[in-house]
């Protein structure tokens, strides 16, 4: 019920990764990367399916060897989400996964081989309508740029990116997106700002090697949040030394916080104090776990007392305001019922699921009505 943020997205060209539109106003895609051995087909497929279940739009898979390329073929046959093959050094691997239906190639033209090998990869991508992601990373800058700048700088990352962009321009290939990642927030943010002024291709955002689940989420939220609030970014990955599923969850949380894209429940909860009338923290933790399957966008406020509870409930899809023994339940800003504090979790879960079903049905009817008008 909150207003959408007035963020003006940077204009960019449109590409497709599989069936997912990227750029030109398309929803910002959230992606992750598998951390299994790609040659372990079963483990990799299971991880990709877990990522699909939490909403991953795109999944990247490292393909370092020809054996991994053969495994990629089997993996691709068993999943639905578009797959990006992460390839370095050996152009033949890129050609092989292209045969196997890869949806996007992540390469650096600078380390894939000489001009002829780059041309072979680009020609193959063009023939099969496969986009490319140019991935520049502060930790693997070209030696001459390291010597020129002394250390990774925004200008160094920009020069590296433009060098690779020029490779593709010379080959008349424009179906690509670009990333300029760094583990330092300020370095990454300024690099993306510079790049956004130079090209109109889609940008893939990330703070690389951000850290563990907690620290990495914080760094990513700050860095990606700054860029997204300025309208920069068309896809994103939150890089965590953690279960890749957490990367997708944090990615959507960042987008939800900026009111850019919503998926599932946005919980609004107080940090609690001695005024709370029920166990707010336990309630929120339990509901977050129980309701992970809900993809309907909705705001749910869970506030332990009447100080801020009614105000938050006014702008929430559903809201609970703590009261003595029973707490007020609000729906779309209107007080509807009272819930027993001793059975709060089960009651609220049932109400949320019912509301989600109601909203889904309303959207289904709206879509049907629009279809009738069009036809």
UniProtKB/Swiss-Prot annotation:
Gene3D superfamilies: Dihydropteroate synthase-like, Sulfite Reductase Hemoprotein, domain 1. InterPro entries: Dihydropteroate_synth-like_sf, IspG_bac, IspG_bac-typ, NO2/SO3_Rdtase_4Fe4S_sf. [4Fe-4S] cluster binds at residues 270, 273, 305, 312. It comes from the Bacteria. It catalyses: (2E)-4-hydroxy-3-methylbut-2-enyl diphosphate + oxidized [flavodoxin] + H2O + 2 H(+) = 2-C-methyl-D-erythritol 2,4-cyclic diphosphate + reduced [flavodoxin]. It is an enzyme of class 1 (oxidoreductase). GO terms for molecular function: 4 iron, 4 sulfur cluster binding; 4-hydroxy-3-methylbut-2-en-1-yl diphosphate synthase activity (ferredoxin); 4-hydroxy-3-methylbut-2-enyl-diphosphate synthase activity (flavodoxin); iron ion binding. Pfam families: GcpE. Disulfide bonds: none annotated. Converts 2C-methyl-D-erythritol 2,4-cyclodiphosphate (ME-2,4cPP) into 1-hydroxy-2-methyl-2-(E)-butenyl 4-diphosphate. HAMAP family: IspG. This is 4-hydroxy-3-methylbut-2-en-1-yl diphosphate synthase (flavodoxin). The gene is ispG.
């Amino acid at each position: 019920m909150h207003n959408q943020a007035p963020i003006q997205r940077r204009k960019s060209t449109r590409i497709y990764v599989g069936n997912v539109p990227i750029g030109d106003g398309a929803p910002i895609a959230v992606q992750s990367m598998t951390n299994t051995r790609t040659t372990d087909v079963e483990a990799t497929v299971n991880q990709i399916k877990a990522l699909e279940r939490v909403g991953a739009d795109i999944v990247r898979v490292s393909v370092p060897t020809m054996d991994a390329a053969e495994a990629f073929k089997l993996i691709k046959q068993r999943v639905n989400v578009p797959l990006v093959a992460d390839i370095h050094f050996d152009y033949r691997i890129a050609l092989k996964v292209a045969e196997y239906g890869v949806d996007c190639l992540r390469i650096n033209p600078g380390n894939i081989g000489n001009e002829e090998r780059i041309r072979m990869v680009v020609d193959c991508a063009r023939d099969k309508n496969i986009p490319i992601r140019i991935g520049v990373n502060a930790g693997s800058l070209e030696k001459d740029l390291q010597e020129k700048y002394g250390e990774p700088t925004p200008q160094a990352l920009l020069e590296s990116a433009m060098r690779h962009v020029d490779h593709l321009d010379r080959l008349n290939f424009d179906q690509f997106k670009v990333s300029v990642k760094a583990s330092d927030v300020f370095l990454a943010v300024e690099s993306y700002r510079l790049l956004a002024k130079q090209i109109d291709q889609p940008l893939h955002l990330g703070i690389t090697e951000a850290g563990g689940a907690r620290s990495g989420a914080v760094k990513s939220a700050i860095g990606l949040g700054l860029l997204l609030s300025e309208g920069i970014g068309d896809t994103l990955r939150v890089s965590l030394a953690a279960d890749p599923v957490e990367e997708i969850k944090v990615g959507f949380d960042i987008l939800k916080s900026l009111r850019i894209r919503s998926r599932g429940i946005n919980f609004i909860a107080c940090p609690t104090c001695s005024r709370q009338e029920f166990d707010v923290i336990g309630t929120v933790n339990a509901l977050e776990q129980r309701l992970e399957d809900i993809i309907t966008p909705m705001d749910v406020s869970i506030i332990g007392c009447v100080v801020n509870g009614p105000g938050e409930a006014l702008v929430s899809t559903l809201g609970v305001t703590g009261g003595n023994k029973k707490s007020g339940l609000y729906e779309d800003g209107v007080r509807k019922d009272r819930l027993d504090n001793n059975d709060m979790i089960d009651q609220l879960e049932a109400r949320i699921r019912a509301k989600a079903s109601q909203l889904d049905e309303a959207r289904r009817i709206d879509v049907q009505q629009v279809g009738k008008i069009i036809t």
